[in-house]
């Protein structure tokens, strides 16, 4: 059962990555591609390179928050983790299909909040801080 869940988890992670690429690449590079400053393939290569660099260098604190601060790390069983990934990917897929830009971060946090609500372990004080930052950030 664990091996099957690992295979499903890898498939779901690929599904999420595909949808992150569909969502975030357009937002980040759409104007440059639309104005013909760069080609789509160049945008894709830049997205991969800088996505990896950002994850490796400055993404660690976000990973810590997402993996153990919104809900306790113990809630992330293999099944719960696959479910969170699936709902993140499914939400992004729907927004991609309708051409609506969606924040990957907000979508992933929303899926984790769902886990926290279902398990009764949501860190509400931290969510207040996160939602406040979402409201203030565009200003």
Residue ranges and their predicted role:
Residues 1-7, 47, 55-81:
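Helix-loop-helix hairpins and the membrane-proximal interhelical loops
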Residues 21-29, 37, 98-110:
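Short, non-helical or kinked segments that cap or interrupt transmembrane helices
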Residues 21-30, 75-86:
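Hydrophobic alpha-helical transmembrane segments
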Residues 31-38, 110-122:
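Interfacial segments of multi-pass membrane proteins
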Residues 37-48, 78-82, 124-129:
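Membrane-interface alpha-helices at helix entry/exit sites of multi-pass transporters
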Residues 57-68, 97, 101, 122-125:
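Transmembrane alpha-helix boundary signature
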Residues 122-139:
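Structural signal for the N-terminal portions of transmembrane helices
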């Amino acid at each position: 059962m664990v091996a099957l869940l690992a295979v499903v988890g890898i498939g779901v992670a690929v599904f999420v990555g595909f949808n992150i690429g569909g969502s975030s690449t357009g937002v980040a590079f759409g104007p440059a591609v639309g104005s013909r400053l760069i080609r789509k393939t160049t945008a894709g290569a830049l997205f991969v390179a800088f996505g990896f660099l950002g994850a490796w260098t400055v993404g660690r604190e976000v990973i810590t928050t997402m993996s153990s601060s919104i809900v306790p790390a113990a809630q992330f069983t293999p099944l719960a983790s696959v479910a969170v990934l699936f709902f993140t990917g499914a939400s992004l897929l729907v927004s991609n299909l309708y051409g609506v830009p969606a924040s990957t971060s907000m979508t992933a946090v929303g899926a984790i909040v769902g886990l926290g609500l279902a398990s009764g372990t949501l860190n509400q004080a931290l969510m207040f801080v996160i939602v406040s930052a979402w409201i203030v950030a565009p200003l």
